[in-house]
C-alpha cells in the first residue's frame, strides 16, 4: 500500500514541477499546446486546456443552446466565458 501512495505523490510532484504558471487569469505560455476543440485557460495559477467552441458569445446564456458537453469524463454545460463558449461542470 505504501508503494501506491509513494507513486501517487511522485506523479503529483512531477505534475507541479512541470506545470506552466499563469498570472492574472491569462495563460500566454507557448509551452502548453492544446488539442483541437480546446483553448488555453488559467485556473488556480496554472495554465490548462479547456474544452471550448469557436462560437463567439457576449452573455452567459448565449451558449446554452449548444446543449451538454463533456470535460475530463464529466458531463457539463456550455457557458460564455471570455467571449467564447466553454464547457463547465458544477
Swiss-Prot record:
It is found in: Secreted. Detected in hemolymph (at protein level). In oysters collected in the summer the expression level is highest in the digestive gland with low levels of expression in gill, mantle, labial palp, style-sac midgut, gonad, heart, and hemocyte. In winter expression levels are higher in all tissues with highest expression levels observed in the digestive gland. Within the digestive gland expression is limited to the basophil cells of the digestive diverticula. The keyword Disulfide bond applies. Keywords: Antimicrobial, Disulfide bond, Protease inhibitor, Secreted, Serine protease inhibitor, Signal. It comes from Crassostrea virginica. Contains 6 disulfide bonds. Slow-binding inhibitor of serine proteases. The inhibitor rapidly binds to the protease forming a weak enzyme-inhibitor complex, and this is followed by a slow isomerization forming a tight-binding enzyme-inhibitor complex. Active against subtilisin A, perkinsin and trypsin with dissociation constants of 0.29 nM, 13.7 nM and 17.7 nM respectively. Not active against thermolysin, papain or pepsin. Has antiparasitic activity against the protozoan P.marinus. This is Serine protease inhibitor Cvsi-1. Residues 1-19 form the signal peptide. GO terms for cellular component: extracellular space.
Amino acid at each position: 500500500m505504501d508503494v501506491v501512495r509513494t507513486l501517487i505523490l511522485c506523479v503529483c510532484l512531477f505534475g507541479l514541477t512541470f506545470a506552466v504558471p499563469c498570472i492574472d487569469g491569462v495563460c500566454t505560455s507557448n509551452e502548453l499546446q492544446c488539442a483541437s476543440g480546446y483553448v488555453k485557460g488559467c485556473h488556480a495559477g496554472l495554465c490548462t486546456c479547456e474544452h471550448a467552441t469557436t462560437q463567439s458569445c457576449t452573455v452567459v446564456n448565449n451558449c446554452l443552446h449548444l446543449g451538454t458537453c463533456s470535460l475530463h469524463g464529466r458531463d457539463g454545460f456550455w457557458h460564455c466565458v471570455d467571449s467564447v463558449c466553454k464547457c463547465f461542470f458544477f
